[in-house]
Amino acid sequence: MTYPFLLRWSSPLAAAALLLAPIAAAQAAAAPAGLTGNAEAGKAAFRKCASCHQVGPSARGGFGPKLTGVIGRKAGATTDYKYSAAMKNANIVWTEQNLAGFLKAPSDFIPGNNMRFWGIGNAQQVADLLAYLRTQ
């Protein structure tokens, strides 16, 4: 007797789905739920980011990649910055949820990336930064 609802480990697709489901759930849970970001507060908070990143029409990559239009962009996709292999191979799009998870703990979210930053523990500050980045 066969049970079509049972997944077989011999199916690579089924195995991948089971293994990746917890990662996807963790990334979705990383968003600062229920918080409304303030773009002006985010602009002020971005001053710390500006030591490595630029935004705006004349932004370019330097010590870190430019962040203009980062929301909705594939990770590791701009051509003016030399990304780590980990970032190039992350195969994610910078949704607000993914950015929130990355800003909270960059090295945990994408192990082996080049960002030398401990992360932001304040969920409101993350929401504010996302609100500001939405305007860029």
Where are these regions (language model features)?
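Electrostatic cytochrome c docking/interface patches
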Residues: 26-46, 57
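Bacterial N-terminal signal peptides that target proteins for export
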Residues: 2-16
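Protein kinase-like catalytic domain
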Residues: 53-56, 134
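C-terminal segment of classical bacterial N-terminal signal peptides
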Residues: 18-27
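C-terminal capping alpha-helices of c-type cytochrome domains
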Residues: 93-136
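Short, cysteine/histidine-rich loop/knuckle motifs that typically chelate Zn2+
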Residues: 48-51
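Gly/Gly-Pro-rich "capping" loops immediately C-terminal to redox-active cysteine motifs
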Residues: 39-43, 57-96, 114-119
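Short, basic/glycine-rich phosphate-binding loops at helix/coil junctions
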Residues: 18, 80-82, 110
